[in-house]
Structure formats: C-alpha cells, structure tokens
Amino acid sequence: MTTLFNFNLQKKTGVIYYSNKKIIRKFSTNTKNKTLINEYIGFNWYLEMYKSKIKNKIFKTEFIKKHNYINFPLIKAKKIYFWNTLKENEKYIKILINHYLKVWPKHSINCYHGDLTVENVLFENNLSPIIIDWEFFKKKEPWGLDVCHLLISAVILPTLAKKKKYIPLVELQLFKKYWTIFFKGKKLI
C-alpha cells in the first residue's frame, strides 16, 4: 500500500510511505530542486557523524537522481510537535542538545541542519533522537547555530501557533536557562 503524506505545491516536494517496502520516499516534481540534494547530502553527513558516536544504528538512504527522489528507511519513533511549549518539550530539548554536543564536531565552522526544531526530530524509545528533514543543510556555518534555532523556535513557534501576544515568563526563563548552559564558556564567532 502507498500513502501520500503530503505534497507542498510551493516547494514542489512530497512525501510518500510505501508500507510493503517499509520506506519513506521524499520526491520533487522539479528536476533542479536543490533542497532534495541538500536533504540527501545533509542526512548522509549526519548519519556518518551519528554512526561514529552511537552503535547499533543502520540506516541506508538511496538517491535516485534520474527520477528525483530519495528513499529513507522507515523509522518507528515518537514525533514531538512544535506547538507544544518549551516547558512541555523540555525533556526532549535537553536530549536534543546533548545529542548535538555528542554528534557535531567541535569546530567553530561546521555543518548546519538549517531548520532544527522538535518537529524535525524523531525520538526512538522516547530517548534516542534522529534528526530528519535536512533540506536546508549547509556545510559552513558557525557551530551551535542549530541550537540557537532550536531554542528560539521552541519559544516562538508555540506562541505564534496559539496566537498569543507575548511569550510567557516561564518560557523565557527556560530559554535563558538552556541558552546559558549551552553557550557557557564557548568562544563564539
């Protein structure tokens, strides 16, 4: 059975689930779609870094350039939603920050996911993060920029989604806590 999860008319990309093959296929109707190439390069960079840090993980992606799609393995995991507050997602934010510290090389200029939010992470067994959706991948950005994006989006997106006029104080306090912990003692560019 085949199921179309979504199709973005603006980006001209979509996601299909093939249950018989146990794969997720990301495709583009635009043959010059750079985001699909970024997705493949970024995810494979991440897998290479991830593999060297975490054992017993075997993922294989397949880029079929001729037909403009990427096959990803089906990953059974929990998805966290961006509209949950930082307080609600605090456990997952902590896990993800620790994951970043373990996986990303400690160079001042590094690879960048480009859209790191809780929405773009799958959590196996509620604990092991797998970062997905690498379409905005870049090779040369400042180390920690993804965590900046993660923390800012964790307070802004729920506020916007719930149409609030301000960010609750508890959210700002948590933001400051994790920002300070992450960047304390780090030399930033």
Regions found by a protein language model. Name each.
Residues I37-H67, P73-E119:
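Conserved kinase catalytic-core helix
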Residues I16-S19, W104-L145:
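Active-site acidic catalytic loop and adjacent metal/ATP-binding pocket
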